[in-house]
Structures are given as C-alpha cells and as structure tokens.
C-alpha cells in the first residue's frame, strides 16, 4: 500500500531543531548594504553627461538648409509684405554667413596644403639673409681698397635686398592663393657633389633659387616688393589687399588675361574641329553604308534579272 504523504507530515510544517527557517515577514537581508535607516546611502556611479562642444563656426549644411527654407517661403504668393521683408533680410544674412564659412574653409585648406613648402622656403631665405648680413659685416671690417670694398658692398646690398624680399615673400604670400616656391632641392650626384649648386653666400646648402633674376621671379614677388615700400604686407597676407596689377609694370596681369583668352579660343577651335571631324566621319560612314547596300542590291538585282530572262 503506498505511503500517505500529507501536508501535515511535511518537514516545513514540522520544523526540527536542526533547521532554522526565516520568517517571511522580516525585511530581506543584503550583504552589501547597511539596513539601518540612519546609515548614509552609498555613492553610486552616475553617468556624467559631457556637454557637446559648441563649434564657433556655423555648419554649412545647416546654412544651406535655412537658405532653401527661406527661398521656399519667399516663393509663396500669399506671404505678407512685412514677413517677406524679414525673410529677405534673413536670406541675405544666411548667404553672407555661408560665403564667409566657405572662404574660411578654403583658407584653412590652403594653409594646410602649402604649410611645409612655405616653411622650407622661409627657413632657407632666413639663412640667406643672415649669411649675407654676416658677409657684409666682414667686408666692411676687412682691409681692402676703398674702391674694391665699395664694389663688394654694393653687390652685397643688392643681393641682400633680394634676399629680404624673398623672406617676406615666404611670410606674407597670400594665404588663400596657391603658393609658388622660390627654392628647389638640389640633386646630389653619386660622389656627393651637387648639380648647379650656387655660391654659399647666395643660397642655402642643398637648395637653390628657381628664379635667378628679377625678371624671372613670380608675379607675386614684385607685389611683395611693392608692399614692402608701402607697408601693406599684413593686408597682402590676409588677402585684404586688391592686387589688380600682378607685376610692377602691369604686364603680368595683361599677359595672363591674354593667355587665358588665347587658351579659351584654342580650346573652342579644338572642340569645333573635333565636332566637325566627328560629323564628317559620321556622314562618310553613312555614305559608305548606303553605297555598300546599293551595290549589293544591284548585284542581287542583276543576278535575278539574268535568271528571269534566261528563263
């Protein structure tokens, strides 16, 4: 006969002395916390929200979106006059901000692009100026004839003037324009000598001037020379100075305009000649195809006619 298990015979209902059962009416015990009411709460780690960095410059996409929204609003016919005036002013402000931001980005990109080239040119030009100044002091203190000393000092002063213009060229060249280097690295031969290396008094070792004479200098070099006399180098560097005549004589700008005009004309003539050649070849191929098909049809027709008459 099976044993009769009942609730009264369970070990929970009849606890023994060996096992202690917790009363469920008590608060649960926790090992990591103090259950007393007066105990201070433990400091838990809270997620620290880092505030977003506010960019000092506006977003280009945001400005473009605002411009589109304002233009869409201005296209409405039922827009009141006062609201239209406000939106037109806002549109002008947004467009101005967008233009300034694009110019700032272009400026920073050009600075980053030509930073290293300008640094090398400035370093070489500084060494040239210091070397020539030291040479000038040595010649002035030397025991030479008055005539020979005067000739050497005059030649050194001319070289020193050019070297100072070169240095200012590397420093005050407009930051928003493409930089044209003044110095180039000298290639070394297998025996260690350099090809076409100039005198040590003129250029730094390992570098030489790309443009030997004043006439061969870039157009901006003459602008820098002029700004040195006028005292407007800072304006030139920041691009706030209008430089319509690139050369001191004004030939540079006219020449560049003429070159651009001639280049555009040559491009137009080339494109026209290409189009005409393409048309001629197209017509020729069409004519050839027609002649071939007509010849084939004539041959087929002769054969068929001959066969018909033979019959």
UniProtKB/Swiss-Prot annotation:
Main location, first listed in the record: nucleus
Subcellular location as annotated: Nucleus, Nucleolus
GO biological process terms held by the UniProt record: maturation of SSU-rRNA from tricistronic rRNA transcript (SSU-rRNA, 5.8S rRNA, LSU-rRNA)
InterPro entries: Efg1, EFG1_rRNA-proc
Polar residues composition-biased segments: 7-17
One Gene Ontology cellular component annotation held by this UniProt entry: preribosome, small subunit precursor
The organism's place on the tree of life at top rank: Eukaryota
Record's compositionally biased regions (Basic and acidic residues): 19-41, 256-283
Coiled coil stretches, renumbered: 59-168
Region feature (Disordered): 1-54, 239-311
Pfam families listed in its UniProt record: Efg1
Family the UniProt entry places it in: Belongs to the EFG1 family.
Task performed by this protein: Involved in rRNA processing.
PANTHER family documented for this protein: RRNA-PROCESSING PROTEIN EFG1 (PTHR33911:SF1)
Full protein name: rRNA-processing protein efg1
Gene source species: Aspergillus terreus (strain NIH 2624 / FGSC A1156)
Gene name per UniProt: efg1
């Amino acid at each position: 006969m099976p044993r009769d298990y009942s609730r009264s015979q369970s070990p929970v209902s009849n606890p023994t002395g060996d096992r202690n059962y917790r009363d469920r009416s008590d608060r649960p015990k926790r090992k990591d916390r103090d259950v007393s009411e007066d105990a201070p709460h433990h400091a838990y780690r809270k997620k620290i929200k880092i505030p977003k960095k506010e960019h000092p410059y506006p977003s280009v996409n945001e400005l473009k979106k605002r411009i589109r929204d304002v233009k869409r609003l201005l296209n409405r016919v039922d827009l009141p006059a006062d609201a239209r005036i406000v939106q037109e002013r806002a549109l002008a402000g947004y467009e101005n901000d967008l233009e300034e931001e694009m110019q700032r980005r272009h400026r920073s990109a050009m600075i980053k692009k030509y930073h290293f080239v300008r640094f090398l040119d400035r370093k070489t030009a500084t060494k040239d100026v210091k070397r020539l100044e030291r040479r000038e002091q040595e010649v002035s203190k030397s025991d030479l004839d008055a005539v020979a000393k005067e000739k050497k000092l005059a030649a050194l002063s001319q070289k020193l003037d050019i070297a100072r213009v070169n240095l200012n060229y590397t420093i005050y060249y407009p930051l928003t324009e493409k930089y044209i280097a003044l110095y180039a690295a000298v290639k070394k031969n297998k025996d260690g000598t350099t090809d076409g290396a100039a005198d040590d008094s003129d250029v730094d070792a390992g570098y030489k001037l790309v443009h030997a004479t004043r006439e061969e200098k870039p157009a901006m070099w003459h602008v820098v020379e002029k700004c040195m006399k006028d005292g407007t180098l800072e304006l030139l560097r920041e691009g706030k100075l209008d430089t319509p005549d690139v050369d001191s004589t004004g030939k540079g700008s006219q020449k560049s305009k003429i070159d651009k005009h001639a280049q555009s004309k040559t491009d137009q003539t080339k494109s026209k000649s290409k189009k005409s050649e393409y048309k001629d070849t197209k017509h020729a191929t069409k004519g050839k195809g027609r002649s071939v098909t007509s010849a084939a049809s004539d041959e087929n027709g002769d054969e068929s006619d001959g066969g018909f008459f033979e019959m």
